Structure formats: C-alpha cells, structure tokens
Amino acid sequence: MTEATYYFIGIKGSGMSALALVLHDLGHQVLGSDITQYTFTQKGLAAAGIKMLPFDPANLKPGYTVIAGNSFTDDHPEIKRAKELGLTIYRYHEFLGKLIEGYTSIGVAGAHGKTSTTGLLAHTLSGVAKTSYLIGDGTGKGIPDSQFFVFEADEYRRHFLAYHPDYMIMTNIDFDHPDYYTGFEDVYDAFETEANQVKKAIVAWGDDPWLRKLKAKVPVYYYGISDRDDFRARNVDRDTKGSSFDAYFHDQLIGHFFVPLFGEHSVLNALAVVAVAHMEKLDAKLIARELGNFSGVKRRFAEKDLKDMIIVDDYAHHPNEIKATLDAARQKYPDKAIIAVFQPHTFSRTQAYEPQYVQVLSQADQTFLTPIFSSAREKTGKIRSEDITAQIKGAAVIHQEDMKPLLQYHNAVVVFMGAGDIQKYEKAYETLLAEE
C-alpha cells in the first residue's frame, strides 16, 4: 500500500476512529472531520496526533482519499465536495474489505459478543505473531508486515458482505436491528451469504439454532460445551478471579486455559479464540499465556472503585447482553448487592423487547431506568421507561439531574448499561458520591 492521505468523514465513529488509527500506524497521513462534541474515541485519535476538524467542505483538498462513515448520506456537504474534486470515495466497510486482503484475516460477527471476542482475539494473537486489528470500541492498531488482521464485522445493513475473510467467528444470530431487518430469516440470510464468502473456515457457536443451519463452501466448526460441538470446553470453573476450562477439538485435548473474565459468555469467547489459533497451528501454551493476561475492552464490564462502591460501565443494550453483564457481576461479586441502571436504546428496540427487558432487569437486586435514548432516525415513540419499571418490583426511573436515589446504597455494585449516552448518568452519580 503506497503512502496516501486519508480523510475520514465522521472520524469519531467507533469503527472509523479504529480504522484511522490503523492507517496512521501503517505510515499514512490521516485526518478527518466530525461533530465537535466530545466522544470517547477521540482520546486515542488525539494521542496519535490525528487532526479532527469540524465539518466543512473546505477541509477537502485534491489528492485526498476519502473514507465516509456509513451514517452520512451522499448529500452530505463534504461528500458532495469530494465528488466535485473527483476524489476517490470509499464507504467504511468497502475500504476495510480491501484492506484485509493482504493478511490472514479473521472477522468476528454476531449480534452479541463481537467486541469482546474481537478484543480477546486481537490481544491473544498479538502476543504470538504480528497482528493488526480493528475493534468496535474505537481501538485500532496497524503493525507493518502483519501476519494476521483481526476485525469486527457488523451485520447492520448487511455491511459485512464487503468482507471476504479467511476465517469468520460467528457468536450468534439475533434479530437486533428491527429498523433494517424484517425478521430472523432476513438476518440468517445475511449471515449465510457472508458464510459463503469465507475462504478457510467458520467458527460458530453451537447452541445457536440458526447458526446450526449454516451451509457454506468451507468447513463450519461449532464451539461450545455440548458433546456435539467440534471445539468443546470441559471442566469449566468460574470463580471470583475469572474462568478456566480444558479445550478439546473432538477428543483431542488442546490445553488448559484461564481468562480473567466473568460470565458464562467469557468461556465461549475464549474458546472461539482457541479454535482459530488451533486451526492456524499456533502454540497452545503461548495462547494460554496471552489469554491469561487479558485486561478487557472499552465499555465492556469496565470497573472502577469509588468510596465503598464498585461502578461498572457496560455497553449492554439488548436483553441477552444485560443478562450476561448481570451474570458477570454476580460471578465476580457474589456477596454484594447488584444495582442496575439501564438506558433503553431507541423506541423501536425498547418496544420490540419490552417483556424480555422486564425479565432480565428483574434479576438485579434493584433496577433503575433512565429515559429512552432516541436516535437520529427516531425521535419519539409510544413506549416510555415508566412502562417497564411499572412491571419490576421496586424499580424506578432516574434522571441525570437527580441521581440521589443511588446514594442510599453502600458496599454494593452499580452497573450502568446502555449504548447511548449512559455515561453522563454515571458521571453525575460519581460527582454526587465523591461529594458525600
């Protein structure tokens, strides 16, 4: 790849910022534009010295290669200007699809667990071989002459069909984007189409009934804890330090692995990593060493201590993710009360999953909901957070300007969950708690 100047429209997007960091590491000139409001991804961009400008068509110069975020339409002023200048314009997923061609590429797809699994795989392979990676939490690393390229593959709007990777891990199939997909069959169709673009093998979760139906040109290996899985975790042990297991490929013992992560899903994510490493004939002892020193990814069970409280920040916004996050909190802190603070994400999703939200949030010792976070595409809806709290014993709606109800808890765990701007509620609570 010859050196070029890449201009990102929407550089603070989580995938976009990660891709910007990868290209910067590989020696290219990188700059871009976005809203001026602070976004958690800009810390990494600023540390790399990557220029972030406010949107302005005058930013674009002859010779730039433009990478446009998927949320911007063709009539965006900067995209229009790029066309006037005759610049090459890629959409994010199109560019990533081209970039991975020079490596042994491993994508991670699925409705839930993508970012955690991508992060775990990137960390583990990096400790064993030269690895570039792009994670959906805004983290990206480009290592010149890498053997592996690990990336998160998002199924939204079928964008992942731009990818033809060597391997694909598929964590699960769920109807997670009711604003785009028509139902489970439609999502399955997208995954099966992608499966037929994979070059070497697919590693899929064995307990997913949809993934069990996959038909592909390459082998599909299933991972899990049941006898019918190809890659299997046995002798699973979960305690307050993390999770350990013996990994088998059919009847062959690959090795014993420990990962300092919590929740049932963490064992599955680690097993998927072991499966890919095994197929690439990497040393199991080195893989075990790297899994054992993993420290997690941004916004996935990120913890801090303040006063006598443990505060957890997590991106969970689908009922299955909330269930997994609360399960992880119970494993790590079996003797503490678990307080859930959840920001529902979009009216359509909240309405589609109302009974499931009631069920999973009832598993916390106490539940609070913030008002629903609306998206740019959908400003209002028929459902309110009060409709959910009314169905959970003792639950209430909490507002950023009054986080006092949380001050009644001591020596407990507060888990803030959501994909919107839940962090502003967490900050408001931390400020109150620190002053107390």
UniProtKB/Swiss-Prot annotation:
Cell wall formation. GO terms for molecular function: ATP binding; UDP-N-acetylmuramate-L-alanine ligase activity. One of its GO terms (cellular component) is cytoplasm. Its EC number is 6.3.2.8. The keyword Nucleotide-binding applies. HAMAP family: MurC. Belongs to the MurCDEF family. Keywords: ATP-binding, Cell cycle, Cell division, Cell shape, Cell wall biogenesis/degradation, Cytoplasm, Ligase, Nucleotide-binding, Peptidoglycan synthesis. This is UDP-N-acetylmuramate--L-alanine ligase. Pfam families: Mur_ligase, Mur_ligase_C, Mur_ligase_M. It catalyses: UDP-N-acetyl-alpha-D-muramate + L-alanine + ATP = UDP-N-acetyl-alpha-D-muramoyl-L-alanine + ADP + phosphate + H(+). Gene3D superfamilies: Mur ligase, C-terminal domain, Mur-like, catalytic domain, NAD(P)-binding Rossmann-like Domain. PANTHER family: UDP-N-ACETYLMURAMATE--L-ALANINE LIGASE, UDP-N-ACETYLMURAMATE--L-ALANINE LIGASE-RELATED.
